[in-house]
A protein has these predicted regions:
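Classical Sec-dependent N-terminal signal peptides that target proteins to the secretory pathway
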Residues: 1-21
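N-terminal helix-cap/turn-to-beta initiation motif at the start of protein domains
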Residues: 18-30, 128-129
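Tryptophan-centered short beta-strand motifs
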Residues: 21-23, 61, 114
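Short, solvent-exposed loop/hinge segments that bridge or flank secondary-structure elements
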Residues: 25-56, 83, 87-95
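N-terminal glycine/threonine-rich, aromatic-flanked beta-hairpin/loop signature
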Residues: 38-70, 98-110
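Contiguous, well-ordered beta-strand patches that form the walls/edges
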Residues: 59-97
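Edge beta-strand at a domain terminus
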Residues: 106-130
Length: 130
């Protein structure tokens, strides 16, 4: 009897863990210029008021931070905790012109090469299936 109970629990938990890995399509931006390509997606599935932002890094979407501000039809600002290690860095997307640009919120230790910050670039809205 205990063996059936334990087997049933293992079976049910394995289905539950598989269900967590299912991802629905998410909206985001595909931004590029001659030197750089960035892909961002915004996950509002868990919290509509505090969406998580992901950036594709080495083929996988990695959590980079939170949405900081948004005005419908105008702009979106989100942090990127992965771009620099000690400098607070954010991206801005102008919804009117479809331009991505960056903001340095604060310089931490001042050891990072700020010249790697890309110039403003054009973006396209995109639905990501992952």
């Amino acid at each position: 009897m205990n063996l059936i109970y334990v087997t049933s629990l293992i079976f049910l938990f394995s289905f539950k863990s598989m269900a967590v890995d299912v991802h629905l399509p998410s909206a985001g931006f595909d931004c590029s210029d001659t030197n750089n390509k960035f892909e961002f997606l915004f996950d509002r599935s868990k919290d509509m008021d505090n969406p998580k932002v992901y950036r594709r890094i080495k083929g996988k979407f990695v959590l980079i931070g939170n949405l900081l501000a948004e005005k419908q039809g105008a702009y979106v600002i989100w942090e990127d905790k992965y771009f620099f290690t000690t400098t607070d860095f954010a991206w801005t997307f102008d919804k009117v012109t479809s331009k991505l640009s960056s903001i340095i919120l604060s310089v931490g230790l001042g050891t990072e090469d700020l010249s790697k910050i890309p110039k403003p670039m054009t973006c396209m809205q995109k639905i990501f299936y992952y």
